[in-house]
């Protein structure tokens, strides 16, 4: 195995500084790996020229002893719904197949400014509507942990940010950016055995992120360790004058304590009982129970809590999602950008045809349903109702985090991320898109409802040799504690995200 | 509708069958005022009129995916100031909504507006209604809502190639939509409301009100009903391009509806366009299409809070309504009342002066610097002579090159009896055509001085008496009015320069009737 | 080396990867568990029998408003079932609960200074349009109802 892949970002940049490894060499190897692992279909587009140029610039800076910071020369991949100037950004849809943004998303420009090397754009479900990365113009993304990658017994990578998760899991890059609306970062992170962070809503800028549900979307971060995740977070977080939904408070960099400095005796862990829902696999349940136990052994107080409106979340999500989709997709008419059909008889005909040709079935159905809910006669009954239940869900969290009685409070919630390990593609594809999302997003959606931060960390492998992960959630802007606890758990379980490569020890 | 074309050939619609007093007309206005700001409502692109095609367009205005709105503080302040000046209640929290429909000049497929919770509500406007030939009266109209919203782009229709060309410079320009209650009854009332609104907005400097640039757009909702009945079906009239058109369009539409009903027809809820050239309203669509805008809260803009606390100051993100209310200048009605009180003007005079801000400025500055001239003389000259001249030439007062100093000089000379009123009127024309030459120079150049010399006048009078024997005879018989013919003759002989007062005195002396 | 790499990936793994000895025994717990060991049932009404009013006129209206066509019976069924899915929350008690439009409802909305900072980028603005004509966007004539 390539030795440097065992390093975390801090170790990598240290070796750059010492001249042991050059960013250029690393990038070349990464591009090589990407090509060799093409079967995963993690990337929709590699940008080798730009990447090598950035790597070259980084090398020069290290040679001059003037590196930009923690991410200088670090390889990153970006989900293809983030605008990258001059590089096609397609959302894996025919509608935007030829769209070349004239600007960079804030997340991308901050990464570039920090000297990161952007390898390319990663695969996703079309317009982020899915939980498998199977509904893409460019074909599905495969999970590197699959027992076999050929034939029909391969496993899904999860979605909708499957490409980004896959790229990090495969060791092609050190970190990747995804997006998370109902679990789209944590879900593939769970299946691919990497860390997936959904920060607090408003902590990261959405300027340049082509939206799915504006009131819930958050850029997500993939990495192979909590420490790497924090390095990326520190680079991209903070208010943005281009995005009115960013939190105005200036961002202070997180620094996580060393493992042996972490004291869990003051930490209160909550186990929300509703998260044990129908379909939770015995192995995930076992994992959940064990980690709760580990925390208790270390001195944390662990108790069961109740978030009574949890199960309503998928229904609320489906309504709000479809309504926002109906609205957000209204701009795709082929006039200013995007696929343009040939029927020029009237705007109505042109728009209708462009949209029929440019959108897949999933997108079209959501647009129709969303418009139905937004009709004046239906608005109160569906949309407003969903928003009221949304408040109930958010208040459930608030009640446990900020309960009036000190004794009733918890700091961190521990739950499963996905209900099972990664499903086989052929089983997953048999379900409707709605059922796919409904089942897999059960534990991840509520965090988006409330805007609170959540992180998925891989714990161990299942009997089938596939990653099993757990999720931690905390109150808004509490990433410091959330990631500290995550880091502690990570150290206890010692999960190796690149274990799948062990077989290739001799060849690499 | 052929019969209606025949009817249109006569300019006055016939209403033979309906006694007009049984029917009421109801008019409600919707005004879109473009806020005068340097940049757009949600993006940082410019707002200048006439910019090159698609150059005042930010990525957000073109709905490029991934772009987000950021609110312009100046627009919020302008909205609040306007709301306060119109007596509204400014809401502490207001929200933005998306209004969905498809059109080529609406790149997002929705307009960002405020429907559920607007910036301000419940205002009121009380304004004078000036109808030629009728006495001035005051009318009140309630302002239901003042909301901030985006303008759409412009599409030019190319009928030849069957396509539309779209320019997005206007897309995203900041608008205030003012929704008035259907409290008006006539076209004149509507025009008067808009005139008053323009005066207010210009004083606040929140809108240029240049209707020819589209900075102020007026749509009218019109219906008729018989006294005692509920409001009738209304039509919406759009495309009214000038203040004058407001009265014409609404009057036309009211009459059209009355006629339609008289002929047994029904009014349909439709949108009609004002055809200024042919002076009529035309249906815009032949089928009224069912529309549902599917309003939805704009998720990228959290609620807008403003500070209602008295005595507060504005901060970067929190605009203080109290601080803005101090900045509101004197409003037109207050000025009128002040003029009436301070200068003992008739209300009609005050209305005319306030209606023409430049005229008002002239009045105030001349009054101040020329205390010897009575106020009455000043405003009479300004209104009866200066304003009349401008109107005759179809000239806007602000476009006339004559300034206050010139008028002051004319009045000074007039008051000092150096020139007479005729000469003063001539000077207006001369000044307008020779903007660089001063009054004194013109008087000398064109020999406009009054003739006051007694000998000269006597000679002229004698000449006039000789020329008008018949009038002399009649006057001496006792018809005092016949004197004017002789006076007129003197004026003619003196090329309008004789001092009329002295002339009259002289003639009276010369023509003393022999017997009583 | 690269070819070997490819080969490895395309081979079926006859033997499982050498599993690292688990330091942790996931079957052994020290404390009584706080994790519920049986699923917590969530009671939601069965709405699959709900009558969904979707007459042809409503469908036409929806298609026109969305400018997306319901091109098959299956699409109509999906729409109906989505509506039934949404009906499942109707019974939840929400009197006196205000809608949560945004989690940032307490924050002051950011206000921008009135300065010209954008625009003047016509080339870029037009760059993604498939059809333009002398700096205009081009669109077919509008307000013509769709063919039924």
Swiss-Prot record, chain C:
<dbReference type="GO" id="GO:0050567">
    <property type="term" value="F:glutaminyl-tRNA synthase (glutamine-hydrolyzing) activity"/>
</dbReference>
<dbReference type="GO" id="GO:0030956">
    <property type="term" value="C:glutamyl-tRNA(Gln) amidotransferase complex"/>
</dbReference>
<dbReference type="GO" id="GO:0032543">
    <property type="term" value="P:mitochondrial translation"/>
</dbReference>
<dbReference type="GO" id="GO:0005739">
    <property type="term" value="C:mitochondrion"/>
</dbReference>
<protein>
    <recommendedName>
        <fullName>Glutamyl-tRNA(Gln) amidotransferase subunit C, mitochondrial</fullName>
        <ecNumber>6.3.5.-</ecNumber>
    </recommendedName>
</protein>
<dbReference type="Pfam" id="PF02686">
    <property type="entry name" value="GatC"/>
</dbReference>
<dbReference type="GO" id="GO:0006450">
    <property type="term" value="P:regulation of translational fidelity"/>
</dbReference>
<dbReference type="GO" id="GO:0005524">
    <property type="term" value="F:ATP binding"/>
</dbReference>
<dbReference type="InterPro" id="IPR003837">
    <property type="entry name" value="GatC"/>
</dbReference>
<keyword id="KW-0496">Mitochondrion</keyword>
<comment type="subunit">
    <text>Subunit of the heterotrimeric GatCAB amidotransferase (AdT) complex, composed of A, B and C subunits.</text>
</comment>
<keyword id="KW-0067">ATP-binding</keyword>
<keyword id="KW-0436">Ligase</keyword>
<keyword id="KW-0648">Protein biosynthesis</keyword>
<keyword id="KW-0809">Transit peptide</keyword>
<comment type="function">
    <text>Allows the formation of correctly charged Gln-tRNA(Gln) through the transamidation of misacylated Glu-tRNA(Gln) in the mitochondria. The reaction takes place in the presence of glutamine and ATP through an activated gamma-phospho-Glu-tRNA(Gln).</text>
</comment>
<dbReference type="InterPro" id="IPR036113">
    <property type="entry name" value="Asp/Glu-ADT_sf_sub_c"/>
</dbReference>
<dbReference type="GO" id="GO:0070681">
    <property type="term" value="P:glutaminyl-tRNAGln biosynthesis via transamidation"/>
</dbReference>
<feature type="transit peptide" description="Mitochondrion">
    <location>
        <begin position="1"/>
        <end position="10"/>
    </location>
</feature>
<comment type="similarity">
    <text>Belongs to the GatC family.</text>
</comment>
<keyword id="KW-0547">Nucleotide-binding</keyword>
């Amino acid at each position: 195995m390539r030795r440097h892949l065992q390093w975390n970002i801090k170790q990598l940049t240290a070796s750059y500084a010492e001249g042991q490894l050059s960013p250029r060499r690393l990038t070349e190897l990464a591009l090589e790996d990407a090509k060799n692992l093409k079967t995963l279909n993690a990337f929709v587009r590699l940008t080798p020229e730009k990447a090598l140029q950035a790597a070259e610039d980084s090398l020069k800076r290290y040679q001059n002893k003037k590196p930009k910071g923690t991410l200088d020369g670090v390889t990153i991949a970006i989900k293809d719904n983030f605008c990258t100037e001059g590089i096609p950004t397609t959302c894996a849809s025919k509608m935007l197949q030829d769209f070349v943004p004239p600007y960079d998303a804030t997340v991308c420009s901050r990464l570039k400014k920090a000297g990161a090397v952007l390898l390319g754009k990663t695969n996703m479900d079309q317009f982020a509507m899915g939980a498998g990365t199977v509904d893409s113009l460019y074909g599905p993304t495969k999970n590197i942990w699959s027992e076999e990658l050929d034939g029909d017994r391969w496993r899904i990578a999860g979605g909708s940010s499957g490409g980004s998760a896959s790229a990090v899991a495969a060791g092609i890059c050190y970190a990747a950016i995804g997006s998370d609306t109902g679990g789209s970062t944590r879900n593939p992170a769970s299946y691919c055995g990497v860390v997936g962070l959904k920060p607090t809503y408003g902590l990261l800028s959405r300027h340049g992120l082509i939206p799915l549900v504006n009131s819930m979307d958050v850029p997500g971060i993939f990495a192979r360790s909590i420490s790497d995740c924090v390095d990326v977070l520190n680079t991209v977080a903070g208010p943005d004058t281009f995005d009115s939904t960013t939190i105005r408070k200036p961002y202070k960099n997180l620094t996580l304590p060393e493992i042996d400095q972490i004291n869990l005796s003051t930490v209160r862990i909550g186990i929300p009982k509703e998260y044990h829902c129908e379909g939770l696999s015995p192995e995930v349940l076992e994992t959940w129970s064990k980690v709760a136990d580990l925390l208790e052994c270390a001195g944390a107080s662990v108790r069961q809590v109740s978030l009574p409106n949890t199960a309503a979340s998928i229904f609320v999500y489906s309504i709000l999602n479809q309504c926002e989709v109906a609205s957000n997709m209204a701009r795709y008419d082929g006039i200013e950008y995007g696929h343009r059909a040939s029927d020029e008889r009237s705007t109505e005909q042109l728009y209708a045809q462009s949209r029929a040709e440019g959108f897949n079935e999933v997108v079209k159905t959501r647009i129709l349903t969303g418009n139905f809910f937004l009709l004046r006669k239906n608005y109160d009954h569906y949309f407003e109702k969903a928003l009221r239940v949304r408040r109930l869900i958010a208040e459930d969290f608030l009640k446990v985090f900020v309960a009036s009685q000190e004794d009733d409070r918890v700091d961190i919630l521990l739950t499963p991320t996905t209900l099972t390990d990664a499903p086989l593609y052929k089983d997953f594809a048999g379900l409707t898109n709605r059922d796919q999302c409904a089942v897999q997003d059960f534990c991840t959606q509520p965090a988006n409802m409330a805007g609170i931060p959540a992180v998925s960390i891989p714990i161990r492998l299942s009997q089938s040799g596939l990653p099993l992960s757990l999720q931690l959630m905390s109150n808004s802007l509490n990433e410091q504690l959330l990631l500290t606890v995550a880091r502690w758990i990570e150290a206890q379980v010692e999960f190796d995200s690149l274990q799948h490569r062990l077989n290739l020890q001799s060849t690499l | 509708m052929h019969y209606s074309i025949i009817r249109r050939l006569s300019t006055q619609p016939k209403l033979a069958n309906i006694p007009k007093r049984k029917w009421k007309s109801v008019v409600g206005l919707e005004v879109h005022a473009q806020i005068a700001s340097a940049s757009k409502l949600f993006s940082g692109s410019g707002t200048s009129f006439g910019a090159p095609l698609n150059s005042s367009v930010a990525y957000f205005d073109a709905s490029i995916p991934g772009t987000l709105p950021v609110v312009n503080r100046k627009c919020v302040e302008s909205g609040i100031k306007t709301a306060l000046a119109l007596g509204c209640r400014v809401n502490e929290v207001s929200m933005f909504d998306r209004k969905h429909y498809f059109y080529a000049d609406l790149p997002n497929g929705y307009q960002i507006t405020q429907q559920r919770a607007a910036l301000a509500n419940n205002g009121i406007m009380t304004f004078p209604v000036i109808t030629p030939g009728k006495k001035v009266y005051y009318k009140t109209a309630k302002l239901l809502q003042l909301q901030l919203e985006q303008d759409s782009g412009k599409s030019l229709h190319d009928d030849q190639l069957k396509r539309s060309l779209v320019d997005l410079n206007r897309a995203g320009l900041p608008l205030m939509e003012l929704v008035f209650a259907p409290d008006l009854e006539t076209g004149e009332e509507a025009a008067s409301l808009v005139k008053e609104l323009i005066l207010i907005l210009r004083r606040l400097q929140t809108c240029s009100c240049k209707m020819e640039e589209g900075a102020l757009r007026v749509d009218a909702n019109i219906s008729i009903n018989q006294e005692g009945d509920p409001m009738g079906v209304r039509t919406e009239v759009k495309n009214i391009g000038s203040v004058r058109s407001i009265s014409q369009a609404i009057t036309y539409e009211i009459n059209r509806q009355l006629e339609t009903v008289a002929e047994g027809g029904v009014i349909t809820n439709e949108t009609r366009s004002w055809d200024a050239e042919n002076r009529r309203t035309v249906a815009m669509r032949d089928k009224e299409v069912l529309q549902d805008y599917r309003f939805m809260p704009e998720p990228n803009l959290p609620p807008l809070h403003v500070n209602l606390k008295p005595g507060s100051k504005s901060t970067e993100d929190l605009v203080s309504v109290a601080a803005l209310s101090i900045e509101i200048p004197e409003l037109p009605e207050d000025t009128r009342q002040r003029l009436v009180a301070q200068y003992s003007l008739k209300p009609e005079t005050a209305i005319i002066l306030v209606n023409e801000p430049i005229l008002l400025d002239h009045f105030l500055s001349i009054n101040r610097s020329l205390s010897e001239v009575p106020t009455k003389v000043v405003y009479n000259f300004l209104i009866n002579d200066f304003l009349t001249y401008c109107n005759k030439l179809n000239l806007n007062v602000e476009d006339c090159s004559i300034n206050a100093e010139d008028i002051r000089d004319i009045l000074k000379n007039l008051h000092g009896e150096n020139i007479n009123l005729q000469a003063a009127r001539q000077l207006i024309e001369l000044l307008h055509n020779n903007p660089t030459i001063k009054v004194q120079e013109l008087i000398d150049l064109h020999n406009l001085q009054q003739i006051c010399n007694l000998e000269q006048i006597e000679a002229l009078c004698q000449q006039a008496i000789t020329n008008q024997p018949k009038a002399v005879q009649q006057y001496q018989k006792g018809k005092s009015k016949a004197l004017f013919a002789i006076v007129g003759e003197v004026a003619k002989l003196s090329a309008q320069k004789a001092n009329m007062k002295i002339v009259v005195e002289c003639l009276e002396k010369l023509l003393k009737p022999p017997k009583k | 080396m690269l070819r070997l790499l490819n080969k490895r990936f395309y081979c079926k793994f006859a033997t499982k990867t050498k599993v690292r000895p688990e330091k942790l025994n996931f079957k052994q717990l020290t404390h009584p568990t706080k994790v519920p060991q049986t699923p917590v049932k969530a009671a939601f009404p069965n709405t699959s029998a709900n009558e969904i009013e979707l007459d042809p006129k409503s469908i036409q209206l929806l298609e026109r408003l969305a400018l997306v066509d319901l091109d098959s019976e299956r699409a109509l069924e999906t729409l109906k079932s989505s509506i039934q899915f949404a009906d499942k929350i109707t019974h939840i008690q929400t009197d006196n609960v205000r809608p949560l439009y945004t989690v940032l409802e307490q924050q002051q909305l950011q206000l921008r200074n009135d300065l010209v900072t954008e625009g003047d980028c016509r080339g870029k603005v037009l760059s993604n349009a498939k059809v333009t004509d002398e700096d205009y966007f081009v669109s077919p004539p509008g307000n013509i109802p769709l063919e039924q």
